[in-house]
């Protein structure tokens, strides 16, 4: 059998390693320029490849494995469908391969606009106290890596994105969950209904023996419950924020904990809030950096859409100086404007997102800066003791950084440099 890997990101790299181990023929087609390291790797295994675009060479294959970010209206995808070539994705491909090696884990899959990584990490953290549990998916651990490293466990927790779900038609987790739905990725999805339908594909193949755990406070989710065949279980909000460990006492964490708690209980285990005492918060998500002259700094670089920014901003009571940066996602910022008007002293805009957000900042004090470095320094000059300066960008990082992690680390480095100069 011959496979084409359409896109050569982190997931397809792991799939390539797996297919080569099996002795399959593989062709790699990357829309952008490949790095020299990637070319060396492909050449060392004698793998044919193309870069800077997808040609009809892609069609000389039995199966095309699509990277999540490939747009569904890509011309080569249309031609592949016309030629009846099987199109598959990492999720469904890997789950079928698990069956071939007689591994049948209990699968828990979580999606949502914000909070996915924190929630799946909490689920794994608690389940590991009972059973061996692996975590993979959109959190940065390719599912195919589990195959390559021959990792097995009783439970498999997956974080899945709308892109991954769009391409996955036969995905049947034992428990699926949608945390929330906010307008997001509308630069990829043509309209909101398309985005919602992609999210709900997480439960499309489930039946009455499976479970769908959902947020009862999200109107987009509640309106679409009729299409769910699995047993429907709403989040349990049976705890107070003050009961959470101190490092988790943020408003958005309530939803994460409610989801994780309900899912763990549906899986048949007790979820004690005390289990989170040793849960390590993920970096770049409401991450406290340091305090300088009474001004606190927070790194929320993972906030790449308006909904995530809103959830972060709501934790502060009018003493916030906010840095927004990066590339916007074709969003409506009306709700963000209302929250900013009540909660921030200053908004510093950096990069392409400035032109998207500026029209919504009437009556809000804002400044445009050429870099995050300039924004940090300008805001620190005007901040008073008791104020907070937070990077919560609201946009993708690709205008200036490789990913949100690199952006967050850069911000923290700037803050510590500032502290050294002030100490």
UniProtKB/Swiss-Prot annotation:
The gene is murD. It is found in: Cytoplasm. It is an enzyme of class 6 (ligase). This is UDP-N-acetylmuramoylalanine--D-glutamate ligase. It catalyses: UDP-N-acetyl-alpha-D-muramoyl-L-alanine + D-glutamate + ATP = UDP-N-acetyl-alpha-D-muramoyl-L-alanyl-D-glutamate + ADP + phosphate + H(+). Its EC number is 6.3.2.9. ATP binds at residues 112-118. The keyword Glycoprotein does not apply. Pfam families: Mur_ligase_C (PF02875), Mur_ligase_M (PF08245), MurD-like_N (PF21799), MurD_N (PF21377). One of its GO terms (biological process) is regulation of cell shape. It comes from Thermosipho africanus (strain TCF52B). GO terms for cellular component: cytoplasm. SUPFAM superfamilies: MurCD N-terminal domain, MurD-like peptide ligases, catalytic domain, MurD-like peptide ligases, peptide-binding domain.
